UniProtKB/Swiss-Prot annotation:
Species the sequence originates in: Bacillus anthracis
Lineage: Bacteria, Bacillati, Bacillota, Bacilli, Bacillales
Predominant location category: membrane
Protein name as it appears in the record: Lipoprotein signal peptidase
Membrane topology: Multi-pass membrane protein
One Gene Ontology term, aspect cellular component: plasma membrane
Subcellular location: Cell membrane
EC number: 3.4.23.36
PANTHER family: LIPOPROTEIN SIGNAL PEPTIDASE (PTHR33695:SF1)
Function (record text): This protein specifically catalyzes the removal of signal peptides from prolipoproteins.
UniProt family annotation: Belongs to the peptidase A8 family.
Catalytic-site annotation from UniProt: D111, D129
Length: 152
């Protein structure tokens, strides 16, 4: 199924990018891409977004396995008839597994995309995080559009 290919693509790009960061950058160093907007910054996270639940690896292992099983089940049941849902779930699955790999093999997640949005120093993130967020946003958009169609 194409949605699993999307997940594998996300995992591959995520892991390759993280490997490049670990091998080529000292922890804490930063390379400006667009001054005051976008940087590549070598960072590690032992928790979830914004460092929430730091050092609770077993919690993340269990939650991720349950979540991945749920996503695969949901993909098998609903993605056959809904392409956008399948793409969204493929992105979410790839992102979840990408960060899970880091937690299992590194006991931390490698983050490196550092963005300043209107001078707000946004937490450093990675490709897996981006895929998760894009997948969730697509599901929200689809849900809103379907709700609008139902009302009409």
């Amino acid at each position: 199924m194409i949605y699993y290919v999307i997940a594998l693509f996300v995992i591959a790009i995520d892991q390759i990018s993280k490997w490049l960061i670990v091998k080529n950058m000292e922890l804490g160093t930063s390379i400006p891409i667009i001054d005051n907007v976008l940087y590549i910054t070598s960072h590690r996270n032992r928790g979830a977004a914004w460092g929430i639940l730091e050092n609770k690896m077993w919690f993340f292992y269990i939650i991720t396995v349950v979540f991945v099983v749920f996503i695969v089940f949901y993909m098998k049941k609903y993605a056959k008839t809904d392409k956008l849902l399948g793409i969204s779930l493929g992105l979410i699955l790839g992102g979840a597994i990408g960060n899970f790999i880091d937690r299992v093999f590194r006991q931390e997640v490698v983050d490196f995309i550092h963005v300043y949005i209107f001078s707000y120093n946004y937490p450093v993130f990675n490709i897996a995080d981006s895929a998760l967020c894009i997948g969730v946003v697509l599901i929200i958009i689809q849900t809103l559009l379907e709700g609008k169609k139902t009302k009409e």
